[in-house]
């Protein structure tokens, strides 16, 4: 028990977290050097391609020091803001964390966010300065930054290079010396926290747990508190990225996989507590927050017959990613689909990509929206995620929208660009701090709606990619918001409705109809494209009809004959216009996302 160390690695994207994990694994000899691949911990293809960690992974390592064998459980965490939920989950099951900072880049916005999660969990934090082999490395400057921003003492910070392997041995020994062993339970009944669960085609739903009290053996009957169900333990394993290692017992402080042979991962949902059926723990393990979706979008199969396939795919994906929520919805324009809730934009992209890749679906995603709180004139307040659910204008007292607290770290030369960008996004500055003479930390309150579309891309281009950005939800505030509807040939297209601030409605509406005019195919009759708020049309464009020469057959002859044919054509067009349907191409729905 005293020889167990549970720790995770905190870092901003690209600061070398997965490489450092690989280095520690190979130093401990857990994975054969022939099998060792770059980024052993990142098992998904998307993770390797994008160079990001999405799912938290774990590995059990052994290390010999001064004649004693130590067990190190390394719990990998994602660095990206959308997956901070995975981070808080991983950190809840550790006693310590390595704070990895790139020696040339310095502290970034997401590093700060994750450190605060670690400090809230009272973890022992070891600062690690990585990439000291780079010519641009300035370890001393980075140590000063950590002390200035986070307030951690860096006198004993460890300098390593995960690429060349310098300092890795010293790092492992520091982990053993500094990170405390798990606290022993006072002979309490078995109690463990599920901090990850996923689906295996052979074994069913697997629960990755951290044991807090007692022990569990193969064949024991266990009780899952959240679902109020009993199951028999079929197998126990220690996690390893290549293949799990079987064991007969999991004891206090250990991290392991429990196999219960379940068909459904919702039976072992993340954050739940597993205890023994006979000798139950009295209360569940607390301090665990469920993920709350922030961004909602409609996902529709391009082939409408594939609706059930999409449902199956989402069910299976939820097994691995407990943070998505979804419910069926229908759209007059797109047919049947789902309203899916995501943690953020990167999460939305990754989920859509995984659905298309792993399940072979072709999907249309509508414009992402956030949850609004609408207080009606009768005093009733409702939450809406879809603009088409908004009550009629005369029934709305006011609308509240979610705000986020954003932290941005940027080189000072781009400060002007960033302030301009944020002012255009209705942001309010709350703090500005010069970390060094060349780097600035900014804090802003921004409406969530302003960052869900393309804020991250715009920020990167305003700062040539040097700024880092992180956000956390803060509160709901009353906003001056209206619903902008788009009508094509007199019919409102529900999938194109968006909620916008009133002062931006005119310009958005104009841009909208202009873009749509280019995309709607020409018909045999005129098509009006209108942007409206309630019944008031604020912008309009017309797609001209295709000409058809009805008088071509008349050679010479009387003018009245031609006039008669032209009149007849005019009548026909009028009738067509009244009943004509216009089909919108896929690009029309995506164009919404591109309008600034």
Curated annotation (Swiss-Prot):
GO terms for cellular component: plasma membrane. GTP binds at residues 14-19, 130-133. InterPro entries: EF-4, EFG_III/V, EFG_V-like, EFTu-like_2, G_TR_CS, LepA_C_sf, LepA_CTD, LepA_IV. The gene is lepA. Disulfide bonds: none annotated. Keywords: Cell inner membrane, Cell membrane, GTP-binding, Hydrolase, Membrane, Nucleotide-binding, Protein biosynthesis. NCBIfam families: lepA, small_GTP. Its EC number is 3.6.5.n1. Belongs to the TRAFAC class translation factor GTPase superfamily. Classic translation factor GTPase family. LepA subfamily. This is Elongation factor 4. GO terms for molecular function: GTP binding; GTPase activity; ribosome binding; translation elongation factor activity. It comes from Campylobacter fetus subsp. fetus (strain 82-40). One of its GO terms (biological process) is positive regulation of translation. Its main location: membrane. It catalyses: GTP + H2O = GDP + phosphate + H(+). The keyword NAD does not apply. CDD domains: EF4_II (cd03699), EF4_III (cd16260), LepA (cd01890), lepA_C (cd03709). It is a peripheral membrane protein. Required for accurate and efficient protein synthesis under certain stress conditions. May act as a fidelity factor of the translation reaction, by catalyzing a one-codon backward translocation of tRNAs on improperly translocated ribosomes. Back-translocation proceeds from a post-translocation (POST) complex to a pre-translocation (PRE) complex, thus giving elongation factor G a second chance to translocate the tRNAs correctly. Binds to ribosomes in a GTP-dependent manner. Coiled coil: none annotated. Residues 2-183 form the tr-type G domain. It is found in: Cell inner membrane.
